């Protein structure tokens, strides 16, 4: 993103903003004014709830799963701990990094590995056959997430943290 909104200066975005952008795209580019359903997982579930509240005439039904209409304190803390893991890397440099903060991105990935997959998933070792051990499964996740942009991840987390469909 060009200055003045580059790096950590990108403006705050709300789930409501995402829904409005999607609605405008659907209408302007595809001529779609009504959706059969909005299906969403996690932050996508938040968007589904927002569609129902903001544009009830434009969506027949919603199928939100693994998400809430409001981010509660536990979710806010979980997100804050992921951000702390990422920003603890000195290379992060308050978001003005010149190279990816690799150890921070790795910490972010490992944090999410504990949340994205359930205790039961890890206990039953469902990471197999893709990985032969927990360490290998974590290494694969870190590698998969390595190209992600740290400031983008934080912007997404902040969007998630602030969401309350009732606001």
Annotated model-derived regions:
Residues 21-25, 111, 152:
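Amphipathic alpha-helical segments that form well-ordered structural scaffolds
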Residues 42-44:
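Short, glycine/acidic-rich beta->alpha junctions
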Residues 38-40, 65:
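Short beta-strand immediately N-terminal to the catalytic nucleophile in serine-hydrolase-like folds
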Residues 58-143:
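Alpha/beta-hydrolase-fold enzymes
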Residues 8-16, 143-146, 150:
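Short acidic-aromatic active-site loops that bind/stabilize oxyanions
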Residues 5, 16-37, 46, 50, ...:
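Conserved acidic catalytic loop of the alpha/beta-hydrolase fold
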Residues 127-167:
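Alpha/beta-hydrolase fold catalytic core
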Residues 1-2:
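Conserved alpha/beta-hydrolase
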